[in-house]
Amino acid sequence: MANNGCCASGSPLACDLGAISASDRPRYHELRRSVAASVIGKRELPDGLAIQIDTARIALPHLAEWISFERKCCPFFEFRIDLAPDSGPVWLSLTGRAGVKEFITEAFAG
């Protein structure tokens, strides 16, 4: 993820990293790096982005923990996790109001 993974530059939307306690920020950054390293696919959505997650690189409970932090600093995101049957693909959808798609696309560039 670009920047700090919470706040894409040049976007009309802004996250508040201060919403995550100072004591929790190291864990947040650790999880953010794990999420970024686990992305194995991307799919544009009308109002956001879906990212395919390699669960060999990040466990589902850790993905959920990262989402809990993101909900604090970026409350304008909507999250959905789709788990396919028979150990199929895991997709995390990040969507929201106008501008969120561009914000998320920039955050997950690369």
Label every PLM stretch briefly.
Residues 68-77, 108-110:
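A common structural junction motif
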Residues 1-61, 80-110:
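Secretory/periplasmic and organellar redox-cofactor proteins
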Residues 60-64, 68:
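Amphipathic, interaction-prone secondary-structure segments
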